[in-house]
Swiss-Prot record:
Organism per entry: Invertebrate iridescent virus 6
Coiled coil start-end: 35-69
Top-level lineage group: Viruses
Record carries keyword Coiled coil: yes
Keywords attached to this entry: Coiled coil
Coiled coil keyword on record: yes
Region (Disordered): 21-42
The protein's name: Uncharacterized protein 346R
């Protein structure tokens, strides 16, 4: 029996073929999401570090002004 699979119509696929297709899609999606997520996280951390440095600088200046009074 020679089967031709139409990948747009999942009803013609065997359960094993469906499982393999879903697993491959899930894995590649996770990889893609992981890479994008990491880049986004790095950008957010960079912004956070910049804001933190500015805040600490302002806090230090406030303390110095209070000490001078």
């Amino acid at each position: 029996m020679n089967r031709k699979y139409n990948f747009n119509d999942e009803s013609s696929m065997s359960p094993q073929a469906k499982a393999a297709m879903y697993a491959a899609n899930k894995k590649s999606d996770a990889r893609r999401r992981g890479k994008v997520g990491k880049e986004q996280w790095e950008k957010e951390m960079e912004q956070y570090n910049i804001q933190k440095a500015q805040f600490e600088k302002e806090l230090k200046e406030k303390k110095e002004k209070e000490l001078k009074k």
